[in-house]
Amino acid sequence: METAIEQLRKLVIEGKESIPNRGVRTFTLLQELTFIENRKQVDYFLAMHRYVKELTSMPDALIGPGHRWMTASHVCHALGITNICLGSISLTPIDFWGDEDSDTTMDIEVDEDTYDWAYFKATEVFGYDNVARTSDIDNIQSEEEINTFRGYRKKQKGYSIVVCPDGVAEHYKVYEVEGDDGLDTLCIDGDVEPTDNIHIFRFNVIRSDTLTRIKRIQHEIVKAGKVCPDMYHRGSANILYYSNGYQTLFDEEDRSIPFLGDKLAKEMAEILFGKITSMEDLLTITALYSARLIYEIQVHNIEDYKKKHGVVRLFDKWRFPYGFLYREDVCWFMTGWIGMTWKESARIVQLMSGQNPLEAECLKHVYLHRGMDNGFREDELNHIWSSLFDRATKRPLPSMAHFVGSMYQYAFLAMLKKDFPEEYQSIKG
């Protein structure tokens, strides 16, 4: 009989073989599997695989392509939990490698129609007495996920599903809510502290109006007798990275695709790229836009500044640490050029916030030695290190993983807008 880790490894390898163009790396998969096994979270990933497989099998459900750290996980991609083409983006599971206490709770983004049904599907998979949901949480916000599209933070509604294999009532005070349709819901009374995802599993369900709009446009495409692209099908997902549909994102008259209709974002696109050809290009614009806007909000009244200067200029004041836009950029530089291990590189990124300066100093010595061994001058290395650790703000660099899920959805909307303009216009944002 197979052990749990053997089952997980088998599923991961089978999933990897179905991903075209070497979209996941074997080395990264093995590193992640070791991390998962050491953290005793094999059962959690197996449970998540079962649950998402059942969710995506629902005929009218639209599940997001991935959210937060999950989009950087090669294991999640191999299991079919996420649908971001990792081979086209330099995503690495920094949160896994840099911090052994990192929170691995998975977020599932769903359309509005599927939002409540996600709980009932969990009861089918794990059993009614073993599953309970928390009350709705409005205005979900994350300090690490500052999606400053048009100057405001992204706000969403969600709830948590808690799974206890030995019964939820053994661990929490619960009560039943009778539904109008005769389906009862088991709810947890009060707040739920973070779980370890070892003995008690937790999944966050997030309601997405963007996914709802995509689904309604897809319905209109089918009604018109046309072939509708499937956002969650791997073969269809890759066309986003080669389609000129990106250009339709930058339409000042269309405010229904957040952030990308903004004049500042369009200006950045025109400055940086003659033609946007990859998700990497969009992520570059997103990082520059967000950082620039944060700076202006902190230093100026953004509206007064726009009135005075016409537009918010991109490069006149903001300085990124040695040109690094994302945490992933720092990790790739540290490993590829300096010779640090992935775990050391990820830890450097986490220490940039100013915590544990003694540990940072120890890593700096290792960094200097390896950098000079690879041909860098000491003054160059010190300059790069200073740009990371001596910044005026200790706000952490953003992660691609925290932006790419939203960018993917907006790019998919742009593709629908280009290829199916009538159906797109029939569903207003």
Regions found by a protein language model. Name each.
Residues 20-65:
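Helix-rich "cap/lid" substructures immediately adjacent to catalytic or cofactor-binding pockets
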